[in-house]
Amino acid sequence: MTAINFRNLAHHTIDISSPEVFFVGNNGQGKTNILEVLYLAAYGNSFRTRTESELYATHARSNEYRVKVMYRGEYTHTVQIFSKNGKKRIEKNLKKIRTKKELISSIPCILFFHNDLDFVVGTPERRRFFLDQSLSMCNPLYLEYLQKYHALTKTKNREIKEKRVQLLDALDTQIATVGFDLVQWRTQLVRDFNVIFTKYYERLGDLAQVRIEYKPSWSDSSVEEIVHSLYKRRKHDLAMGMSMSGPHRDKIHFTRSQALFIPQASTGQRRLVSLVLRMSQAVFYTGVTGKLPVLLMDDVLLELDPEKRERFMMSLPPYDQLFCTFLPGEAYRRYGREKTRVYFVSEGACHE
């Protein structure tokens, strides 16, 4: 991995070929920035910001950065990202990519991050994002349909705001056709996830029957029924100035014994839900693709008691590689294996 002018990272290349790579250092030294580079190479965007200029090193003479990650999985992939003045170019194996669909399967990263708690206590949009990400990782067609659905909904909302109803019939037919498949994929995902999620949560949290519940905005069982429902809801949409139903309004809850779980859950139980979601995502990805993911874990053990930390690390799903960040006082060596590589990070530089 090489980074040039990226946040506070020093300009050098580090060997990340070990099965486990640990980055140890105090806060603010650059540990998370390293994981950010790996995530950037996997998805084409940061998990911390949508503002490209925030990624430029403050000491750089120009507003640009370059990162390069070589990943040897089933095939060897080299991903390079060049960014200058807010414009980004991504190359995979020296060829420019035009859509994220071309990149997303190259380095199958799953990130455990403290902001994952948003999937549990945040807005419905954040929980939908988690479902979308889980499906997009292993189903390129889902990502294509999702992008098409959002484009159609955006067009429909524009027509609604302008009170132009002539195109709404045609738009609703397209939205129903694409949206129906999205709902089917999400329904099956949650069904598959629950087999994994419930088992892991019981193992780590000593609590049975914690489940994910998916509540689609549409209850219709065919495209034709959805088209009819959208027509009946049109007056309401026009009154509200936007489309009020569809996959962009779906809800996801966590339940236990058919009651909502999160309102009564402790802080630790909520954090564990976010961790088990990511574990389930990794297992699901492997089950669908037959490939092992790369796990990125950024200071996610801090809120767990020592016993649960140990149990969590021992229960990690199979992975191709594991990248973890730790504070110096944590028992990181206990989690290492024979070939684990440990880097100590200080002021953006790594040393062994």
Curated annotation (Swiss-Prot):
GO terms for biological process: DNA replication; DNA synthesis involved in DNA repair; double-strand break repair; SOS response. GO terms for molecular function: ATP binding; single-stranded DNA binding. ATP binds at G25, N26, N27, G28, Q29, G30, K31, T32. It comes from the Bacteria. Signal peptide: none annotated. It is found in: Cytoplasm. The keyword Transmembrane does not apply. GO terms for cellular component: cytoplasm. The keyword Acyltransferase does not apply. Keywords: ATP-binding, Cytoplasm, DNA damage, DNA repair, DNA replication, DNA-binding, Nucleotide-binding, SOS response. Coiled coil: none annotated. Its main location: cytoplasm. The RecF protein is involved in DNA metabolism; it is required for DNA replication and normal SOS inducibility. RecF binds preferentially to single-stranded, linear DNA. It also seems to bind ATP. Belongs to the RecF family. This is DNA replication and repair protein RecF. The gene is recF.
